[in-house]
Amino acid sequence: MKLLRWCKANAMPVIAVLAAAVTAVFVPPDAAYLGYYDVKTLSCLLCVLAGVGALRRVGLFPLLAQRLVQVFHTTRGAVTALVGITLVGSMLLTNDTALLTFLPLSWFVLERTGQTKWTALTFILQNCAANLGGMLTPFGNPQNLYLFNHYNIPNGEFLSIMLPPFLLSTALILLCCLFLPREGLTVPRQETLPDKRRTAVYGVLFCVAVAMVLRGIPYWLGLLVIVMALLVLDRRALLGVDWGLLVTFAAFFTFSGNMARIEPVRELFRKLLTHGAMPVASLTSQVISNVPAAILLSRFTDDYRGLLVGVNIGGAGTLVASLASLITFREYTKHVKGQTGRFMVLFSAISFGFLGVLLVAMTLWMR
């Protein structure tokens, strides 16, 4: 029973490891396995998560968010601010970390102001903001970090590729926020202040992580500095890293590497990708999630522009299209009981609506 509960709580890494194990039956482990793993991507992801975790532990993000929300005095204004914070946060913190940080804050605000009836819509819009807002930066989404390093995409080109879908996504999110009422409310205040010295040090460590991602410093140097610093200053920040996400990445590297060596699979994806990387990436993401889709399809195409856009807009749609969406679902069911069906209907309507608009618009844009 305990094992079953643990597997349910860690569904994605468990599924990823099982998928890798199944492919290992067809491609037995050999020396080629060592070439599957992108150590730079794993190192950068670890350092970003650790840096953000340290800042989160000193209470910086909830304080900044609450101060911003206090500027607004209506349901529409407060929720729009919370969604906006999540969108901006996802560009800097990664989408899953932004959701883990700001979804609890949204529940806190909605509950204390008697507006819990808007929890589903607020959480869903925050989910869209995290998944689609994070597309603008190389470290905003895990799949971005992988593709950015795998194809060695220049910083300026990455921004030029992702800016159009980002702007359209932002406009769609803000449009949805207009459906919220302009009821007056009082937002609760938090007076607890983070330790300024520790916050400054952790801020520097986070900047080191960003410099790693943007190739400003060698990744091994950044990894050494951040890990050694946190071992001394805050070991819990390291222990609190989402190790399941790192295991998931490593397992999917194995899965995609093996799949690329199975000839019928290679032939299938070669044929599919003749129809364009973007639609194939978007649709593949709906079934196996956008992170493994990015890793798998990168083995078969050099069209990194289409693949990058495809796996990012492919984060909208089904609940499994993005790993971060499972965080939103888990947070909602933790706070709101007996309304899972209503949540899924609203989630599907909004998420598939976003996917449809973005897919059509970007197909026309990239012709």
Where are these regions (language model features)?
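Flexible interhelical linker loops that connect adjacent transmembrane helices
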Residues: 2, 66, 179-203, 235-239
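Structural signal for alpha-helical transmembrane segments and their membrane-water exit/capping regions
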Residues: 2-32, 42-59, 178-182, 208-236, ...
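Interfacial loop-to-helix junctions that mark the boundaries of transmembrane helices
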Residues: 3-9, 31-41, 153-165, 191-197, ...
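Transmembrane helical segments that form the transport core of multi-pass membrane transport proteins
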Residues: 36, 58, 62-67, 205-302
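Membrane-interfacial loop-to-helix junctions in multi-pass transporters
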Residues: 39-41, 70-83, 112-123, 197-200, ...
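Hydrophobic transmembrane alpha-helices that form the pore/transport pathway of multi-pass ion
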Residues: 82-132, 295-308, 337-339, 363-367
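Membrane-core helix-loop-helix motifs of multi-pass transport proteins
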Residues: 114-182, 188-191, 328-358
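C-terminal transmembrane helix pair
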Residues: 159-170, 174, 279-367
